[in-house]
Each structure stands twice: as structure tokens, then as C-alpha cells.
Amino acid sequence: VTARVPGPTDWEPIVSGNAELELSPVSTGGAAALRMDFDFKGAGGFVVARRALRRAMPEEFALTFRLRGRGPVNNLELKLVDVTGQNVWRHVQKDLRLPPRWKRMRVESRDIDFAWGPSSGGRIKTLGGMEFAIVAGEGGKGTVWIADVQIEDCTPTQAPRADASSAIPGFDAAGALLGSGWKPRPEDAKPWIVIDTVEPRVIGGLIVEWLHEAPPSGFRVRASNDGSR
């Protein structure tokens, strides 16, 4: 399920120090976009485009948008503010070289860290606002266009399943997922096990817990999007 964030209107500028930011909705390349014209006036600081947006957030999600621009190398920050306005989550892309042509950007929820607020952590449950911030690196002045902002629900809906080349009674492939363990038959010269997530998922890592009584052995870990390779 994908929810499209409303178009390039209703964004408000926030700046620090003497920095300047002008926001305007434009049509470019057949797309409605938010245009950010910024000028750090030879100093540091930040400029922010902020929009109020109330929405229940899925447990796992991805934020996608298209980006292009021109200007010096600076940091781009994406911030999510909860409905209280006090808790903030942030993704920082440091030293961003603005692409002259439209580039699709994708930020997974696991890469959006809790930044500050009284909740002291956890995930965002109800969105209250969204911010795109340009934080001075080289500073200078330039223009950024942002379009097609979407929130994609990536919460798994199906349980993973497992299959194996063989198994002894009581230690079938499913045991690898349930914690009881998987054991191939002694005569299985080339044992293998496949764990299928059924639907696309972001995999942060894999922990292999070797059963205490199992003899030491080498193994390979392979990954595939469709199981064909």
C-alpha cells in the first residue's frame, strides 16, 4: 500500500541566522514539484521546508521521492515529526551532490533514527509533519526540486517459510525459524536449507546459531530476490 503525500503546496519555510529560503510550487518535466531556492549568505546554518501532515504510520515503511537540483555540496535531512510536535525522527544524507536530472530516492524506516523528544525512542506511530532540510556543508546558494513524495507500507503480511534438502524427525526446516533447530539426515552429503520470506522484505542481517552437538562445518549464505539465483 502506498500513500501519496499531497502536492507541493502548503509547505512553509524555516531558516536559521541570515539564511534565506523561497518555496514555490512548480511544474517541471511533467511533474508537480516543490522548488526550494536557498542562500546561506556566506555562512552556515540550515533551511527547512516543513509541511503539516497527519497520518497513521505503518510499522515498517519507506519514504520515496524524486530529487534534482543545482548548487554546492550540503547535507540533506529528512525529518518526521509526530503528532505531538515534540518527537523527531531523522535521516541524514551527508555531502549530497545534487543530481542535475531527476533521481528516485528511497529511505527505509530502519534508516530513519530517533533524533530527540520526550518519548526517548521507539517508532513513529502517528505522523504530524514532514520536513526537508538543507544543512550547510559548503553552504552557498542553489535550487532543489522535490516531487512525488510517497509513504510505502512495507509491513510484512505473511510469515516466512522454510524448506530443506532433508531433515531428521523433530528437526525439520521450520525448526530453523522456530528456534528448535534444523538437522539434515546423516546421509545427506550436500545439505541445504532455503528460507523464503514470501514477499519482499528488507533484510538487516542473518544470525546463524550452530547447534551445540552439531559437528563444525563450513557453509555458504546466498540471497536472491526471486529464488532463481
Where are these regions (language model features)?
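Extracellular ligand-binding interfaces
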Residues: F38-P118, G139-W145, Q150, I207-R229
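Disordered, acidic Ser/Thr/Pro-rich linker "stalks" and the adjacent N-terminal cap
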Residues: A3-R4, W11-P13, G17, S24-A32, ...
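Extracellular glycan-associated modules
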Residues: G7-P13, S119-G129, G140-T143, I193
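Short loop/turn motifs at secondary-structure junctions
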Residues: R101, R123-T126, W145, V202
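N-terminal, post-signal-peptide region of Sec/Tat-exported proteins
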Residues: L34-M36
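Solvent-exposed, conformationally flexible loop/turn segments
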Residues: V1-P6, P58, L98-W102, G179-S180
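Hydrophobic/aromatic beta-strand segments within beta-rich folds
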Residues: L63-F65, V107, L127-V135, P191-E209, ...
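Short, surface-exposed loop and linker segments with low hydrophobicity and enrichment for Pro/Ser/Thr
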Residues: E22-A31, L67, G117-G129, E199
